[in-house]
């Protein structure tokens, strides 16, 4: 979560020395009589199953923020703030050991607050570590900030983003490190306007007139938050601390919908408010390194609380009726998590062992009410529901890794999770209970040879639990005759993932991957006898995806960098649900991508970048998608020894980023076109202050379930 404003921190009253480290000669770029001497150091390498991107060795990283710079890591693509990894599903982030448990928008703001100049390296972990909760085909991106000597440092960043409306964003951070304590504070505030349009056509196979609807939504979101850390060091090998994280959202959405039913039309207006939407995370931790071999223990407690109230009003006018139809919904949802974790590292001569155990208690309480009425109805129709859901997860894990000699390295891991769930629908008086346990093995084997490159083969098993809002059975209306609801009977989905990858030959990266799942969650739309459309999730899909991704990067003349890549994959989806007309789909597809970076001046401080990606038609979860393109340009300028950075960026200037899809049901076909209005022009400015040689102040919170609340 990114964070608002820069606030001064109280200084610890402990003596400290100013011991600035001096970079080695190969780390420095020297200007002597206008002759620039640049030493080439490895920018990317693959080691122990990880792709490692050394940011400090990359001259093209100047002025980039923490999200844009991810696009420079092989296999990672960044588009309009969305990060994806070829062959993978969920993307999780670790910053200096902190597993970031944020929703997509808050995570994007957190990354934007990072500067390339403050990042030491970025690691891509395709095989999820056993110490973290089992997830579906997950990939972890670990960012390590520069960790040097004592002192104070900070940064501020601001941007203006012109899309349909002007958007503003501001953030800042400050940290202070002494011999006895660490302190840090991040803060941010944003004021965003978004517009999107969604056109849907239902073509019925029985000759009934098509149903065509067009929906426009304009939303305004104000978001702010902060993250604070305090750590006290009893000794170099023992410390205790606390982390506080708070996020505030206020969202107002106004929508219009026009629907042609073939014989009559309807017009709807809606307004939805969600405010204040608050989330608080508190973490207490104790770290102790003991023994002659560097054995360590970490104890962590997490508390998470999210409060999400919503109010929605919908008014609909039908051309064949003189009455207005209104729907009013009010809801309050509270999430409370408690978790305790103990992690141990035992570096023996014969293997590096990691082991631990965890317990998580999840409580979700929702109260919802719905009122619908026509103008001349004396008594409106009222419905209400109270849904309470609890989930308790006990877990234990162990991993062992070691060098096997002759360039080989191996790692095996095993995690066990046992889960108890209970759901209560008080309006119906029903109680659903379930319990299940599962083992999640993982294995990783790599081989490195300097002149040949690095090969890595891995296998892992993961599990995707339903999002908490997917379990809530209450109906949320978007128009007077269309709603979405959850399904309290959803079960978790088990995923099997395997891949072989290679890096070498001066910048070639390639990966062959596969992932398959049974009883995956899919969404099904249905019409009732009155023509009302419902959308609900079900465990109804069997999916498989296998593909080959290749990426190559090369620098010419020391100033011009080119990157080209492509992906070819085969997807398979199958369902036994009779709602679908086509219950099995198999298809080949792929993408091509090319990007360039050019240094435009002698000091190498002015960099022009361009990026283009073309996606070919593909199918996913029995839905056919048409091709589309992504295109963006940027110009970055660094001043004051890289402390001041200016950026000008243009995204989707030709309006190519639109999603078109088709679904085949037994009785009808759905054609959909979604335009998120991603075109914008952005001007950003960042400034770093304080000493350059300062510790990064972070510590892992290890809270890993709050992502399921949004």
Where are the predicted features?
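Short, acidic, small-residue-rich periplasmic hinge/interaction motif at the N-terminus
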Residues: 17-57, 78-80, 88-90, 126-127
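Outer-membrane beta-barrel signature, preferentially recognizing the C-terminal barrel domain
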Residues: 387-389, 463-512, 516-518, 534-546, ...
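Face-selective signature of the C-terminal outer-membrane beta-barrel domain
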Residues: 181, 225-249, 273-425, 446-456, ...
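C-terminal beta-signal and adjacent terminal beta-strands/loops
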Residues: 16, 639-710
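Short strand-turn segments of transmembrane beta-barrel domains in outer membranes
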Residues: 56-57, 150-174
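Short acidic/polar hinge/loop motifs at secondary-structure boundaries
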Residues: 66, 72, 99-126
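Extracytoplasmic beta-strand/coil segments of soluble accessory domains associated
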Residues: 44, 67-102
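N-terminal periplasmic accessory domains that precede
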Residues: 34, 66-69, 107-109, 124, ...
